[in-house]
Amino acid sequence: MQPLVIIAIAALVVAIIIAIVVWTIVYIEYRRIKRQRKIDCLIDRIRERAEDSGNESEGEREELSKLVEMGHHAPWDVDDL
């Protein structure tokens, strides 16, 4: 094989590897952002219910705790809003 063909094949392989790495990072960040939006939405709903009725929904709090993987305790005090 000619050296130019070898260089072209090597460059193509490197480009494919870089593309796979970049798209993997993009996918991981997309999942992280999507998860954070869910958490933000749940926090907003809990705040609205706390303002309206004086207490928050236990079901939403459990769902939020599953998303943040902290058990049943959120890292902030929701009651003092």
UniProtKB/Swiss-Prot annotation:
Main location: host cell
InterPro entries: Vpu, Vpu_cyt_dom_sf
Biological source species: Human immunodeficiency virus type 1 group M subtype D (isolate NDK) (HIV-1)
Segments crossing the lipid bilayer: 8-28
Post-translation changes: Phosphorylated by host CK2. This phosphorylation is necessary for interaction with human BTRC and degradation of CD4.
Places the protein is found: Host membrane
Family, similarity comment: Belongs to the HIV-1 VPU protein family.
Record keywords, A-Z: AIDS, Apoptosis, Host membrane, Host-virus interaction, Inhibition of host innate immune response by virus, Inhibition of host tetherin by virus, Ion channel, Ion transport, Membrane, Phosphoprotein, Transmembrane, Transmembrane helix, Transport, Viral immunoevasion
Activity regulation, free text: Ion channel activity is inhibited by hexamethylene amiloride in vitro.
Function: Enhances virion budding by targeting host CD4 and Tetherin/BST2 to proteasome degradation. Degradation of CD4 prevents any unwanted premature interactions between viral Env and its host receptor CD4 in the endoplasmic reticulum. Degradation of antiretroviral protein Tetherin/BST2 is important for virion budding, as BST2 tethers new viral particles to the host cell membrane. Mechanistically, Vpu bridges either CD4 or BST2 to BTRC, a substrate recognition subunit of the Skp1/Cullin/F-box protein E3 ubiquitin ligase, induces their ubiquitination and subsequent proteasomal degradation.
Region (Disordered): 50-81
Subunit composition and interactions: Homopentamer. Interacts with host CD4 and BRTC; these interactions induce proteasomal degradation of CD4. Interacts with host BST2; this interaction leads to the degradation of host BST2. Interacts with host FBXW11. Interacts with host AP1M1; this interaction plays a role in the mistrafficking and subsequent degradation of host BST2. Interacts with host RANBP2; this interaction allows Vpu to down-regulate host BLM sumoylation.
One Gene Ontology term of the molecular function aspect: monoatomic cation channel activity
Protein name, as recorded: Protein Vpu
Membrane topology of the entry: Single-pass type I membrane protein
GO cellular component: host cell membrane; membrane
Domain notes: The N-terminus and transmembrane domains are required for self-oligomerization and proper virion budding, whereas the cytoplasmic domain is required for CD4 degradation. The cytoplasmic domain is composed of 2 amphipathic alpha helix that form a U-shape.
Other comments on record: HIV-1 lineages are divided in three main groups, M (for Major), O (for Outlier), and N (for New, or Non-M, Non-O). The vast majority of strains found worldwide belong to the group M. Group O seems to be endemic to and largely confined to Cameroon and neighboring countries in West Central Africa, where these viruses represent a small minority of HIV-1 strains. The group N is represented by a limited number of isolates from Cameroonian persons. The group M is further subdivided in 9 clades or subtypes (A to D, F to H, J and K).
Bias kind Basic and acidic residues: ranges: 62-81
Ranges in the topological domain labelled Extracellular: 1-7
